[in-house]
């Protein structure tokens, strides 16, 4: 606790030798008073030593020669004090206690009080020789000398105070013992309680400051002058100085090199900027502050130097490039009006040392937490560049909760508000008033006044609250807002953290049901340790499922556990056995008759327990069948059900594992002179099947409009025989539910669907929500479209691009709600009726999200086996959101990923991040619109590499026809194919030399043979030092299928690398780390035995740029308990 108000002076320091005679002082006092100072601190008041050091006093009764007076020093001080008082000022005097000039009368009269330094090195060192010859130091090693000096200085300071000295500055007080100061100042204040004494200790180390903490000083000088305005030491020094006395800051040195000297090489405006910054920083951060004479005009002449340079000082004043008198007056006025700038309060630095600007908060009291108001100081340490202030960084956890700010206003009540981001000019310093925001109190007003009628209601609610905590349920998507995705036949592993107060045993279960069921199924959870619980639930039906987690206190298990522990410790358990008997009896009286078998077991147990002697009851209570009976009767104390019900979408395998082949059926004739038909496609089915594909995907097969039809290579003028883009859907022949007449009839399409199924292929159709200007809907439903003010249609645009052959319906046009939505849903249902269950949706990110959520849910409610592929090459957030809304799978950025690091990062995001629960990537190597630059002019081996990457990294991959022929001719500086099939018919020689159909077939065969390759999950990247080789492993959750894949990323040169298998693989098998493995090459029918975790692979792109091994423990390898952890995270593993 502070015993008196902080000493917070506004000091102006004067070197007496530079001011001049006594008659020169009144004009100085007048100016200083006008600037708002309340004290003038005088240094060099007394006659200096022969060598001229002003702090080495030669005669305490003689003033400095510069006063030009016959008065003694005390009388001169009295005259100065009287003159200062006339201007509202008080005089403070600097005194030096620990040393005197050797010619000082006190030294002559009392040699035992002092010691002189006669060491040779002190005399030889030119930096200290003059000082050593000039001075005598107090004999601090002598108690008698210290007592005598204390008496002398007590009388001396008293006499100076009588002469008008209102405060004293003690130079280097740390040179005298702290206890000596405490006794001296205590005695001095017995006579003059209001006489402040300042410790002149700037730049002193922590130990010196700590020693003076109890010495009794009223104030102490800080080291602000030398702070870089960044480092945290200033705040730490302030904390220590507050224990010594109120910190006094100064913008410039009152002895030693001046600020103007530091910046002497800078431009005049920079020097002024430095002075202004120093001024406001000192005024804001000191309890008191001191301005050395000449600072206001940027004078560089040193004060308190051995040789006074009065003429140079006056010349510098006369030629000063700036005058800060007005700013000084403003600072003094602000300090007088602002308690937070005058208190000996806490200063907190709110920004780090490397922040662009430094922000500090200071209060007036002991701690900011207890201050009513504070001041925010923001300063730019850079004199050349502005700095931005980010409140979010500066105010995080702000001490005292000060979050309302306003500029300091003269006499007006400021309007406080939140701190907005702002910029500080170069070298600027800004001060803001700070207040706390009113804390949030939610208790009713009558409760806050002490009458607490609301207490009963709140405590009643608390009593009904959930005693058991259920947290961190997984897997969930966005806290259950969207469904987790799984495929039919999987078991969903549900995990949760479940815990409660005390030591009672808990039990938990996962309840689940299909969305068309009313009752809940239940699976008991197993405890995995550390409050983790798990249950696996079967997913045996397609469609939406729901699950929830429940928990309860298992009183029977708790009692049995307690009895067992006490018995094992040799404690009596008779009372606990009686509790068990009563618990069983209570359950029998409450239990319903719905479970007669459990009731029978419990009745038999109760009877046996009554009849058994005490030594046999223990065995009866611990019987497992008794615990099972209690569980079956669902005696669940404090049962807690987690509020949310979490959805799960169960889809068929094609949603997670499929190999897609895209072709234009109109090119199926293999003759550019004849439009292909569905019947022509049938002839291609064996070729596509033999490459191992199972999904055959067509771009739109509907009638194509003729208005603004695009010509070859996307030209704006179409020739009469140009076929146009199939995405310009609709003509007089029909719209989205019609078949292009040249492809055949709807019956022909149905025949194709049946033929594809006979070849183990499934047809996927493109669902493109767009129309040509000739679409029947424009005449039948013009209100479904957007029209321009001139009556023209609003064509599809992606400014500045315009697609005159396409118009988009307006989902929120007045006439379109809900008719358009229903019509589009009916399009999907129409093609489902025609035998299609897979739809690739064109650009879904350009259509409203609520439509997709409704449409997919509505279709799946009728046909849960429907699969939707999202073709949304857009921002990740939108791609992920579409997946959450129900799209089964999505195109991805794989098409543009090329480097090893990119593959690792992207697969880690997809397989180990939140997206793993709902986003299934379909890795297309190319599309009719995307001819990737890494394939253009690339060798055959690059196509094999991209196919291997897509086929092994994801369970879903696809290619557009022509990829197997290594087609890559592109338009200049474009990813568009030259002579793109999107605008014309194409004929190909499917068996021409150089095709990669055989390699694709081997890849797809490896995918079918290895369940680990049928998903993107379970992947772990191995450490391989060669960045041109990607090595990874994939494992099923049960580790009953593990593959290791190595792929060269260099299509030109052979590459080789070591790689290290992850230890998690061995844990998954339940074998020792590095045990023998059998590795079966999946494309070369070669078997190897691997020893240890490190292995080697060499890949020649001209032979085979990839290797796929199925690995398993060798015969005879001992197996233990396997690590049944969740799917292996997709991260790169480094050998330790």
Swiss-Prot record:
Q: Which spans are transmembrane here?
A: none
Extract the Pfam families matched here.
GLGE_C (PF21702), GlgE_dom_N_S (PF11896)
Gene this chain is encoded by: glgE
> Per UniProt, where does alpha-maltose 1-phosphate bind?
710, 770, 805, 843, 982-983
Active site, renumbered: 842, 871
Asked if the record carries the keyword Glycosyltransferase, the reply is yes
Gene3D superfamilies named among the record's database cross-references: Glycosidases, Golgi alpha-mannosidase II, Immunoglobulins, Phosphotransferase system, lactose/cellobiose-type IIA subunit
Q: How does it assemble?
A: Homodimer.
Provide the residue span(s) of the region labelled Unknown: 1-439
Q: What does this protein do?
A: Maltosyltransferase that uses maltose 1-phosphate (M1P) as the sugar donor to elongate linear or branched alpha-(1->4)-glucans. Is involved in a branched alpha-glucan biosynthetic pathway from trehalose, together with TreS, Mak and GlgB.
| Enzyme's top EC category | transferase
Q: Which SUPFAM superfamilies match?
A: (Trans)glycosidases
Provide the protein name: Alpha-1,4-glucan:maltose-1-phosphate maltosyltransferase
